[in-house]
Amino acid sequence: MIHPICFPMHRSRVISFYEKTDLRVPAKLFAHPVIKPDVSNIPYPLPSALETYHCAALGEDGVVWLGSSTTGLTRYAPNEPRKADVIQYFSAERDLVDNHVRALLADGHNVWVETENGVSFIEMRLMSMEEKAAMLTKETLIGIDRHGMISHRALMRDNDITSRVPYGHCDNDGGFTAEFAIGEMMRYDVMAREKGPDSPEAQDAKRVALRAFEAALLLMYISGRGDGFVARSYITTSEILPDDGLFYRKEGDYAVCVETRASKRKNMVGKKIDASTPVPDRLAELYRSEGFSDSDIIYKGDTSSDEITAHFAAMYFAHKILGPDDPELDDLIQRATRSTMQHIVEHGFELW
């Protein structure tokens, strides 16, 4: 008999940044005496050089916060049940404004941290794995999603996911998006089984899974070549053209190789490739709904074998989980599977 794994509640870091002049910052932080801690009796390796620890604060349950003058903050929690949580490291730009810690003020399980250029409040929030997953999924959809693809995105302001830059293609767009979609499909499968397919939890998971999977599947059709060629990623004409590979701009029934260092090196600038096979409307809606047409698409050339592995894994799970109730999607999956495998075989088991 299969038994589910039950994860206990766990403290996770939630970070807030403040200016030193912000009235929400406790005045005690700046008036707190700075006393160099004795770390010689801590029976574990510490992430910063011992001589750089120059301030400390005592929290609840035996927790000791240790500030380094050069390399951030350490949390020593000898009573944590998980060994991995006994020593934790906090640094800029994720947790601190910078790594030059000046003063600490414990606040229950949490801590205020003054560094050279600002203040951080580190909340060690007790949450379930489900709560943490929901928080991370929300941040992913707000801060990383690009035309449905999930890989990475730069920020203009540290820790502010609303400041994401409006571009950011990645060679892993296909693979990472496919893998993200698999996770959301499994979430949908569990929620549908436990709470019903029409429950808000199941419908939310299905919505996220479909968008991500369709974005990954689109890369198997977007070139318009109709021969199973899989693109690595794509951008629109509103995005910055990277100079790190072969890119093709779609123009009517053709796609033209644009100028990059790679295309010049290979003497491929201006080369025309067939693009007459229509992109399925359902998948093209990912960019058309944002106001872009087929002629606004610039796709990146052939992808790699690890991306293909992720694509096929996602198609398998989509066929099993989403396909039974979505024959249109299942047909797109089967067509992509056949054409991609045929392409690989015909090209000597390579992806070009």
Name each region found by the language model:
Residues 74-75, 120:
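WD40 beta-propeller blade core
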Residues 154, 170, 204-352:
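Extended ligand-binding groove/face enriched in aromatic
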Residues 77-82, 125:
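Short loop/turn segments that connect beta-strands within beta-propeller blades
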Residues 125, 178-198, 295, 310-328:
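Well-ordered alpha-helical scaffold segments within catalytic/enzyme domains
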Residues 85-92, 130-135:
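Beta-propeller fold detector
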Residues 63-66, 110-113:
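Conserved beta-propeller blade signature
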Residues 4-34, 42-60, 91-106:
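Short coil-to-beta transitions that initiate beta-strands within beta-rich domains
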